[in-house]
Amino acid sequence: MKAVLAKDLTITYNGEVALEGVTFEIEEGKTLLLLGPNGAGKTTLLKTIACFHREYRGELRVFDREPCEARELIGYVPQSHSLNERVPLTALEVVAMGGIYRSGFVHFKIPPEILEKAEDALAFVGLSNVKDRLFRELSGGQKQRVLLARALISDPKLLLLDEPLSALDPSARAEVSNVLGKIKRERGITMVITTHDINPLLEIGDKVMLINRRLIAFGRPEEVLRDSVIKSVYGPLARVIPVGGKLFCITGDTHLHRHGGGCPR
Protein backbone atom coordinates (compact mmCIF):
# COMPACT_ATOMS: atom_id res chain seq x y z
CA MET A 1 0.00 0.00 0.00
CA LYS A 2 1.06 3.57 -0.61
CA ALA A 3 1.58 5.36 2.69
CA VAL A 4 1.39 8.72 0.94
CA LEU A 5 0.23 9.44 -2.60
CA ALA A 6 0.23 12.91 -4.14
CA LYS A 7 -0.84 13.74 -7.69
CA ASP A 8 -0.51 17.25 -9.10
CA LEU A 9 -0.63 18.59 -5.55
CA THR A 10 -0.60 22.37 -5.17
CA ILE A 11 -0.57 23.84 -1.67
CA THR A 12 -1.47 27.45 -0.97
CA TYR A 13 -0.80 29.46 2.17
CA ASN A 14 -2.70 32.68 2.79
CA GLY A 15 -3.59 32.74 -0.89
CA GLU A 16 0.02 32.33 -2.06
CA VAL A 17 1.28 29.17 -3.76
CA ALA A 18 3.71 27.42 -1.41
CA LEU A 19 4.23 24.25 -3.45
CA GLU A 20 3.01 23.69 -6.99
CA GLY A 21 2.13 20.62 -9.04
CA VAL A 22 3.96 17.99 -6.99
CA THR A 23 3.51 14.28 -7.73
CA PHE A 24 5.15 11.55 -5.64
CA GLU A 25 4.41 8.41 -3.65
CA ILE A 26 5.87 6.72 -0.58
CA GLU A 27 5.58 2.98 -0.07
CA GLU A 28 4.58 1.76 3.36
CA GLY A 29 7.59 1.14 5.59
CA LYS A 30 9.94 3.32 3.53
CA THR A 31 11.72 6.54 4.49
CA LEU A 32 11.60 9.71 2.39
CA LEU A 33 14.16 12.45 2.99
CA LEU A 34 12.76 15.84 2.00
CA LEU A 35 15.43 18.34 1.01
CA GLY A 36 15.21 21.99 -0.01
CA PRO A 37 16.29 25.50 0.97
CA ASN A 38 14.44 27.76 3.39
CA GLY A 39 11.01 28.62 2.03
CA ALA A 40 10.96 25.63 -0.32
CA GLY A 41 7.68 24.31 1.11
CA LYS A 42 8.99 21.41 3.19
CA THR A 43 7.21 22.23 6.44
CA THR A 44 4.04 23.22 4.60
CA LEU A 45 4.00 19.84 2.86
CA LEU A 46 4.42 17.99 6.17
CA LYS A 47 1.64 20.00 7.80
CA THR A 48 -0.66 19.31 4.86
CA ILE A 49 -0.03 15.56 5.06
CA ALA A 50 -0.71 15.75 8.82
CA CYS A 51 -3.98 17.67 8.29
CA PHE A 52 -2.73 20.75 10.12
CA HIS A 53 -3.01 22.70 6.88
CA ARG A 54 -5.91 22.19 4.48
CA GLU A 55 -5.43 24.68 1.66
CA TYR A 56 -4.56 22.46 -1.29
CA ARG A 57 -5.84 21.18 -4.59
CA GLY A 58 -5.01 18.03 -6.48
CA GLU A 59 -4.94 14.58 -4.92
CA LEU A 60 -3.40 13.73 -1.55
CA ARG A 61 -3.99 10.36 0.10
CA VAL A 62 -2.58 8.91 3.32
CA PHE A 63 -3.03 5.13 3.47
CA ASP A 64 -5.73 5.59 0.82
CA ARG A 65 -7.65 8.09 2.94
CA GLU A 66 -8.02 11.83 2.97
CA PRO A 67 -5.34 13.26 5.31
CA CYS A 68 -7.86 14.33 7.95
CA GLU A 69 -9.38 10.84 7.96
CA ALA A 70 -5.97 9.31 8.68
CA ARG A 71 -4.87 11.50 11.58
CA GLU A 72 -4.87 8.63 14.08
CA LEU A 73 -2.25 6.89 11.92
CA ILE A 74 0.15 9.84 11.93
CA GLY A 75 2.82 10.91 14.41
CA TYR A 76 4.23 14.42 14.00
CA VAL A 77 7.39 15.95 15.47
CA PRO A 78 7.64 19.68 14.67
CA GLN A 79 10.90 21.58 14.35
CA SER A 80 10.11 23.59 17.48
CA HIS A 81 8.03 22.12 20.30
CA SER A 82 5.21 24.16 21.83
CA LEU A 83 5.70 23.01 25.42
CA ASN A 84 5.78 25.72 28.05
CA GLU A 85 9.00 24.88 29.86
CA ARG A 86 7.95 26.95 32.87
CA VAL A 87 5.54 24.10 33.63
CA PRO A 88 7.56 21.49 35.56
CA LEU A 89 6.82 18.42 33.44
CA THR A 90 9.02 15.36 33.66
CA ALA A 91 10.25 13.55 30.57
CA LEU A 92 7.80 10.73 31.33
CA GLU A 93 4.88 13.16 31.57
CA VAL A 94 5.79 14.78 28.25
CA VAL A 95 5.79 11.38 26.54
CA ALA A 96 2.53 10.40 28.23
CA MET A 97 0.90 13.53 26.82
CA GLY A 98 0.98 11.83 23.41
CA GLY A 99 -1.04 8.92 24.76
CA ILE A 100 -3.44 11.15 26.69
CA TYR A 101 -4.18 13.15 23.55
CA ARG A 102 -4.88 10.01 21.53
CA SER A 103 -7.03 8.39 24.20
CA GLY A 104 -9.21 11.42 24.78
CA PHE A 105 -8.27 11.83 28.46
CA VAL A 106 -8.19 15.49 29.45
CA HIS A 107 -7.56 15.29 33.20
CA PHE A 108 -4.18 15.56 34.92
CA LYS A 109 -4.10 12.06 36.38
CA ILE A 110 -2.31 9.89 33.85
CA PRO A 111 -3.86 6.40 33.53
CA PRO A 112 -1.46 3.57 34.48
CA GLU A 113 -1.67 1.96 31.03
CA ILE A 114 -0.53 5.19 29.39
CA LEU A 115 2.31 5.60 31.89
CA GLU A 116 3.45 2.07 31.05
CA LYS A 117 3.42 2.85 27.33
CA ALA A 118 5.32 6.07 28.00
CA GLU A 119 8.01 4.16 29.90
CA ASP A 120 8.29 1.69 27.02
CA ALA A 121 8.62 4.54 24.52
CA LEU A 122 11.34 6.21 26.59
CA ALA A 123 13.18 2.90 26.84
CA PHE A 124 12.98 2.51 23.06
CA VAL A 125 14.74 5.85 22.51
CA GLY A 126 17.32 5.05 25.21
CA LEU A 127 16.14 7.46 27.89
CA SER A 128 14.77 5.33 30.72
CA ASN A 129 17.33 6.94 33.00
CA VAL A 130 15.85 10.45 32.60
CA LYS A 131 12.16 9.64 32.96
CA ASP A 132 11.85 11.53 36.26
CA ARG A 133 13.96 14.51 35.24
CA LEU A 134 12.30 17.76 34.24
CA PHE A 135 12.01 18.13 30.48
CA ARG A 136 13.40 21.67 30.62
CA GLU A 137 16.62 20.40 32.22
CA LEU A 138 17.44 17.96 29.43
CA SER A 139 19.97 18.56 26.66
CA GLY A 140 18.80 19.38 23.16
CA GLY A 141 19.40 15.84 21.93
CA GLN A 142 17.58 14.33 24.91
CA LYS A 143 14.61 16.64 24.37
CA GLN A 144 14.43 15.58 20.73
CA ARG A 145 14.43 11.91 21.69
CA VAL A 146 11.69 12.57 24.27
CA LEU A 147 9.60 14.19 21.54
CA LEU A 148 10.21 11.18 19.32
CA ALA A 149 9.02 8.94 22.15
CA ARG A 150 5.92 11.11 22.53
CA ALA A 151 5.14 10.60 18.85
CA LEU A 152 5.76 6.85 19.08
CA ILE A 153 3.47 6.21 22.06
CA SER A 154 0.41 6.24 19.81
CA ASP A 155 1.88 3.53 17.52
CA PRO A 156 1.71 5.59 14.31
CA LYS A 157 2.01 4.05 10.86
CA LEU A 158 3.44 7.29 9.46
CA LEU A 159 5.94 9.51 11.26
CA LEU A 160 6.51 13.07 10.02
CA LEU A 161 9.65 14.78 11.33
CA ASP A 162 10.49 18.42 10.65
CA GLU A 163 14.24 19.07 10.90
CA PRO A 164 14.86 16.57 13.73
CA LEU A 165 18.62 17.26 13.69
CA SER A 166 18.54 21.06 13.65
CA ALA A 167 20.47 22.94 16.35
CA LEU A 168 22.02 19.72 17.71
CA ASP A 169 25.71 19.11 18.27
CA PRO A 170 27.39 16.23 16.38
CA SER A 171 27.01 13.79 19.29
CA ALA A 172 23.30 14.52 19.68
CA ARG A 173 22.81 14.28 15.91
CA ALA A 174 24.32 10.81 15.96
CA GLU A 175 22.07 9.74 18.86
CA VAL A 176 18.90 10.99 17.17
CA SER A 177 19.96 9.49 13.82
CA ASN A 178 20.52 6.14 15.54
CA VAL A 179 17.02 6.25 17.03
CA LEU A 180 15.54 7.00 13.61
CA GLY A 181 17.42 4.01 12.21
CA LYS A 182 16.06 1.87 15.03
CA ILE A 183 12.51 3.03 14.27
CA LYS A 184 12.98 1.99 10.65
CA ARG A 185 14.52 -1.39 11.46
CA GLU A 186 12.40 -2.48 14.42
CA ARG A 187 9.08 -0.71 13.93
CA GLY A 188 8.86 -0.52 10.14
CA ILE A 189 7.17 2.86 10.38
CA THR A 190 6.97 4.98 7.23
CA MET A 191 8.89 8.21 7.79
CA VAL A 192 9.06 11.56 6.03
CA ILE A 193 11.97 13.64 7.32
CA THR A 194 12.72 17.22 6.30
CA THR A 195 16.31 18.36 6.52
CA HIS A 196 18.80 20.98 5.42
CA ASP A 197 21.65 18.57 6.12
CA ILE A 198 20.92 15.26 4.47
CA ASN A 199 24.23 13.48 5.09
CA PRO A 200 23.60 12.06 8.59
CA LEU A 201 20.28 10.56 7.45
CA LEU A 202 21.14 9.01 4.11
CA GLU A 203 21.75 5.53 5.43
CA ILE A 204 18.05 5.26 6.34
CA GLY A 205 16.68 7.11 3.30
CA ASP A 206 15.01 4.97 0.64
CA LYS A 207 14.05 7.97 -1.48
CA VAL A 208 15.06 11.62 -1.62
CA MET A 209 12.80 14.43 -2.77
CA LEU A 210 14.29 17.82 -3.58
CA ILE A 211 11.81 20.69 -3.72
CA ASN A 212 11.95 24.43 -4.16
CA ARG A 213 8.28 25.45 -4.32
CA ARG A 214 7.98 22.75 -6.96
CA LEU A 215 9.37 19.27 -7.45
CA ILE A 216 12.99 19.39 -8.60
CA ALA A 217 13.88 15.70 -8.29
CA PHE A 218 12.53 12.52 -6.72
CA GLY A 219 14.14 9.10 -6.62
CA ARG A 220 16.82 6.97 -5.00
CA PRO A 221 19.58 8.96 -3.27
CA GLU A 222 22.10 8.28 -6.02
CA GLU A 223 19.59 9.49 -8.63
CA VAL A 224 18.79 12.78 -6.92
CA LEU A 225 22.11 13.69 -5.33
CA ARG A 226 24.03 14.69 -8.42
CA ASP A 227 26.05 17.85 -8.90
CA SER A 228 23.84 19.25 -11.63
CA VAL A 229 20.66 18.73 -9.60
CA ILE A 230 22.03 20.15 -6.34
CA LYS A 231 23.56 23.17 -8.09
CA SER A 232 20.24 23.94 -9.80
CA VAL A 233 18.74 24.66 -6.36
CA TYR A 234 21.65 25.75 -4.16
CA GLY A 235 23.89 27.50 -6.68
CA PRO A 236 27.37 26.94 -8.11
CA LEU A 237 29.10 26.37 -4.76
CA ALA A 238 26.94 23.34 -3.97
CA ARG A 239 28.43 20.00 -4.84
CA VAL A 240 28.43 16.27 -4.26
CA ILE A 241 31.81 14.86 -3.25
CA PRO A 242 32.76 11.16 -3.38
CA VAL A 243 34.74 10.19 -0.27
CA GLY A 244 35.59 6.63 0.68
CA GLY A 245 32.76 5.01 -1.24
CA LYS A 246 30.17 7.52 -0.07
CA LEU A 247 28.87 10.79 -1.41
CA PHE A 248 28.89 13.92 0.76
CA CYS A 249 26.36 16.53 -0.21
CA ILE A 250 27.43 20.13 0.34
CA THR A 251 24.60 22.62 -0.14
CA GLY A 252 25.98 25.73 1.54
CA ASP A 253 23.97 25.10 4.72
CA THR A 254 26.41 22.48 6.03
CA HIS A 255 30.12 21.74 6.37
CA LEU A 256 31.81 18.48 5.59
CA HIS A 257 33.57 18.23 8.96
CA ARG A 258 30.39 18.47 11.01
CA HIS A 259 29.31 14.87 10.58
CA GLY A 260 30.37 11.52 9.27
CA GLY A 261 27.30 10.63 7.24
CA GLY A 262 27.14 10.29 3.51
CA CYS A 263 25.12 8.90 0.70
CA PRO A 264 25.78 5.48 -0.82
CA ARG A 265 27.31 5.59 -4.28
Annotate each language-model stretch with its function.
Residues 155:
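Conserved catalytic motifs of ABC-family nucleotide-binding domains
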Residues 50:
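Helix-to-loop junction immediately C-terminal to a conserved catalytic motif
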Residues 134-138, 142:
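Conserved ABC ATPase signature
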Residues 58-70:
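Conserved ABC transporter NBD signature motif
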Residues 96, 111-130:
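Conserved ABC ATPase "signature" region
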Residues 226-227, 233-265:
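ABC ATPase nucleotide-binding domains
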Residues 159-163:
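Catalytic Walker B motif of ABC-type/P-loop ATPase nucleotide-binding domains
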